[in-house]
């Protein structure tokens, strides 16, 4: 959502839907997404997840919580809290993604809680299939909104 054109977010998101894509978020008001900066400022993944959960409870907000992870250690930290509803695998290769999916699915079996998995970062329309075949629930392709090429059109008026 941060990579949409200012003032045009809803139109760009609608265009993705019309083209067959799905939007899982419009902004931070409909799902908490804890990115690396949030994690760093909070003092780590467990602290960021705990603060997000506690804030939602305190404010009476029923928002799902997604955490961005950059490696297996961060995935393990997130899983150890039992808090996230979704784990984002940021800039993972397909091979690292497969290993991460195995780790998360194994945790699910042991703990009885389903956690959605999202691949994101550097994924293109040419590589999306490689990530989808790893068993993730969602694949984000930012190019659908931030790298769209404009259609060259013109309109001719005919005087009758």
Predicted regions, residues:
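Acidic/glycine-rich phosphate/pyrophosphate-binding loops and surrounding catalytic core
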Residues: 1-66, 70-81, 86, 95-103, ...
């Amino acid at each position: 959502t941060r990579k949409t054109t200012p003032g045009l977010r809803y139109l760009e998101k609608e265009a993705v839907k019309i083209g067959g894509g799905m939007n899982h978020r419009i902004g931070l008001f409909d799902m908490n997404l804890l990115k690396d900066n949030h994690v760093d400022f909070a003092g780590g993944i467990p602290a960021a997840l705990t603060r997000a959960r506690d804030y939602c409870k305190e404010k009476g907000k029923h928002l799902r919580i997604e955490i961005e992870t950059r490696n297996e250690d961060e995935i393990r930290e997130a899983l150890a809290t039992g808090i996230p509803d979704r784990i984002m695998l940021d800039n993972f290769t397909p091979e690292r993604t497969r290993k991460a999916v195995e780790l998360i699915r194994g945790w699910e079996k042991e703990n009885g809680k389903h956690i959605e998995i999202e691949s994101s970062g550097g994924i293109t329309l040419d590589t999306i299939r490689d990530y989808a075949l790893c068993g993730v629930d969602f694949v984000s392709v930012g190019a659908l909104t931030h790298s769209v090429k404009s259609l060259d059109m013109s309109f001719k008026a005919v005087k009758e």
